[in-house]
Each structure stands twice: as structure tokens, then as C-alpha cells.
Curated annotation (Swiss-Prot):
Keyword entries, A-Z: Cell membrane, Cytolysis, Membrane, Transmembrane, Transmembrane helix
Name listed for the protein in its UniProt record: Antiholin-like protein LrgB
Superkingdom in the source lineage: Bacteria
Species in which this protein is naturally found: Bacillus cereus (strain ATCC 14579 / DSM 31 / CCUG 7414 / JCM 2152 / NBRC 15305 / NCIMB 9373 / NCTC 2599 / NRRL B-3711)
Subcellular location: Cell membrane
Known function: Inhibits the expression or activity of extracellular murein hydrolases by interacting, possibly with LrgA, with the holin-like protein CidA. The LrgAB and CidA proteins may affect the proton motive force of the membrane. May be involved in programmed cell death (PCD), possibly triggering PCD in response to antibiotics and environmental stresses.
One term under GO cellular component: plasma membrane
Transmembrane segments: 5-25, 32-54, 64-81, 94-116, 143-165, 178-197, 207-229
Family: Belongs to the CidB/LrgB family. LrgB subfamily.
PANTHER family per record: PLASTIDAL GLYCOLATE_GLYCERATE TRANSLOCATOR 1, CHLOROPLASTIC, PUTATIVE SEROTONIN TRANSPORTER
Length: 230
């Protein structure tokens, strides 16, 4: 079957699954479990399983969609441009907050994975979950992780932030728009930015820069943990 499969198969499956997710999210008035990315992932898994298709057959076209993830992150520069004055004024506080948050995320995942006895491949797959998909997947592959698990971890993490991010900020009385945006972007990448956009331009801009910096920090920090994994 693999020899007769065309790239359009993976593309069509992805678009239909995402379209269904978008409709469910709209008609459920934003219910977090119907976030389009999460729904598309679940429907894709079910379709491949029921149809007895292999991941390789799907990924012939799926990887073509993945190719556009990296250039798509350029869109994060738009809200940043609008808030460049605040970025210049608070650059040190912004950078230090994101770096500390990124490192803490990797450390927590590492400790929890060790504590519950996850095997090396699964642990390696979980470590990059703080980064956006375009960055997390290459990191996972480079350290021997399983991209499918990494993708699930990234999306699940983002869904949690999308659903509960505003509640956490309110609970811990985080009121400054810069702090809100940094927290959302550092913890929830693209969906964190979506929440930031709903809150305001400053939150959106700070969330956007957090997504970018978290990716860079994750690339640098994760190799430091590799000697301890085994």
C-alpha cells in the first residue's frame, strides 16, 4: 500500500481533521478539549488505526505540512514589532524570566520522568515539550526521542495552558501584562500566544517573544541533561 500512497493522503487527512476540530471548537463556544490541534491529533490517530494505515503512509504528505511550521513562526514577529519600545525598556527582565522558566520546565520534566521510571526514549521525547512543535520535533529526533510522543506532549501542554492559563494567572494574582504574556508564552507556546492575543497587544507580544526564546534555550539546555539519561 505504501508504494501507491500519494502525498495528498496525509495532507487531506490533516486538513479534514483540523477542519472538524475547528467546527467543534466554534460550536462548543471554545471548550478547551475541542481545541483544533488536539482534536486533529486524536482524529488522525483514530483514522490511521481504524483504516490500518501506517504512520509512514500518512507522513508522506504529513511532513509536507510540517515543513511550513518553521517559516510560520515568523508571524510571531508582528505583535513584537508593535511593542518594540517595551521590549527595549524591559529586555533584561524579559530575557531572564523566559530563560529561568525554560530551564525550570526542562528540569521538572526530567525529575518527574526519572521518578516514575520512564524509559530513555520516552524521556527524551518529553524533554523538549516546552518548545513549539517546529523546534521540539527536531530536538526529539536528535536525542533519540519519538516524534509522535513529543508532538502529543507539546500539544497537550498547550491545551492545558489554553484552558487554564487565565485561571492560573488570576489565582496567583499576576496582573502586569508583561508578566502575563511571558508566562503564557513560556508555558503554552502557540496556544499561549492565542490566549495572550485575547488579553491584549502587550500580552500577545510578550508571549510571542517567549515562544522564540524558549525554543533557543531548550536547544541549548537539553543536551546538558543527556549525560544523566541512561
Amino acid at each position: 500500500m505504501a508504494s501507491t500512497m500519494t502525498p495528498y493522503f496525509g495532507i487531506v487527512v490533516s486538513l479534514i481533521a483540523y477542519g472538524i476540530g475547528t467546527l467543534l471548537f466554534k460550536h462548543s463556544k471554545g471548550f478547551f478539549l475541542f481545541t483544533p490541534l488536539f482534536v486533529a491529533m486524536v482524529l488522525g490517530i483514530v483514522f490511521l488505526k481504524v483504516g490500518n494505515f501506517t504512520f509512514e503512509e500518512y507522513n508522506t504528505g504529513g511532513k509536507m505540512i510540517s515543513f511550513f511550521l518553521e517559516p510560520a513562526t515568523i508571524a510571531f514577529a508582528i505583535p513584537l514589532y508593535k511593542q518594540v519600545d517595551k521590549l527595549k525598556k524591559y529586555w533584561w527582565q524579559i530575557l531572564s524570566a523566559i530563560v529561568v522558566g525554560s530551564i525550570c520546565s526542562v528540569i521538572v520534566v526530567f525529575i518527574v520522568a526519572k521518578a516514575i521510571g520512564l524509559d530513555t526514549a520516552v524521556m527524551n521525547s518529553m524533554l523538549p515539550q516546552a518548545a513549539t512543535t517546529a523546534i521540539a520535533l527536531p530536538i526529539s529526533e536528535s536525542i533519540g526521542g519519538i516524534p509522535a510522543i513529543t508532538s502529543f506532549a507539546v500539544i497537550f501542554n498547550a491545551v492545558i495552558v489554553y484552558a487554564l492559563g487565565a485561571l492560573f494567572l488570576k489565582t496567583f494574582r499576576v496582573k502586569h501584562p508583561i508578566a502575563k504574556g511571558l508566562a503564557l508564552g513560556t508555558a503554552g507556546h502557540a496556544l499561549g500566544v492565542a490566549v495572550g492575543i485575547e488579553m491584549g497587544e502587550v500580552e500577545a507580544a510578550m508571549a510571542s517573544i517567549a515562544v522564540t526564546v524558549v525554543g533557543v534555550v531548550t536547544v541549548v539546555v537539553i543536551p546538558m541533561f543527556m549525560p544523566f539519561i541512561g
